[in-house]
Structures are given as C-alpha cells and as structure tokens.
C-alpha cells in the first residue's frame, strides 16, 4: 500500500483501513505463535502500513 493511495482517502476510510490492518496483524501474530506462518515478512509489512495510516490520521487531524 502506497502512501499516495492513502492520502487520497478520507478519515473514515483511513479508520476502516486501520481496523482491517490491526485485525490482519493480530491474525498473523497468532499464526506465527502457532507455527503456521510461512511468510514472516508480512508482519513487517502490516506493521509499517499501520504506521503509515496512523501518521496520515494525525496529519489530517492537524495535531
């Protein structure tokens, strides 16, 4: 997910995206804990995408 794509979204869409990413992160962590996760790089990607969305939400809030 590119930052430019995220910048085009509104606050509600970003909140929805954040919720989806956090759910995905939780599922990946559970798979990793149970030894079922084959693609460990996905954890890093999701973590960084969460950070991107949170950064944009902060920017849009004007804080």
UniProtKB/Swiss-Prot annotation:
What biological-process terms (Gene Ontology) are attached? translation
Q: Which PANTHER family match?
A: 60S RIBOSOMAL PROTEIN L35/50S RIBOSOMAL PROTEIN L29, LARGE RIBOSOMAL SUBUNIT PROTEIN UL29C
Q: Tell me any Pfam family this protein matches.
A: Ribosomal_L29
The record's listing under Gene3D superfamilies reads: 6.10.140.1970
Molecular-function annotations in GO: structural constituent of ribosome
Matches recorded under CDD domains = Ribosomal_L29_HIP
Q: What is this protein called?
A: Large ribosomal subunit protein uL29
- Record keyword Magnesium present: no
Q: Which gene encodes it?
A: rpmC
Provide the species name: Buchnera aphidicola subsp. Acyrthosiphon kondoi (Acyrthosiphon kondoi symbiotic bacterium)
Q: Which family is this protein grouped under?
A: Belongs to the universal ribosomal protein uL29 family.
User: Which keywords does UniProt give here?
Assistant: Ribonucleoprotein, Ribosomal protein
User: Where does the signal sequence lie?
Assistant: none
The keyword Cytoplasm appears for this protein:
no
One GO cellular component this record assigns the protein to is: cytosolic large ribosomal subunit
């Amino acid at each position: 997910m590119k930052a430019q794509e995220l910048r085009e979204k509104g606050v509600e869409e970003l909140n929805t995206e954040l919720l989806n990413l956090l759910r995905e992160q939780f599922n990946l962590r559970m798979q990793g804990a149970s030894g079922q996760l084959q693609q460990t790089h996905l954890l890093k990607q999701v973590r960084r995408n969460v950070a991107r969305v949170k950064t944009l939400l902060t920017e849009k809030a004007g804080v």
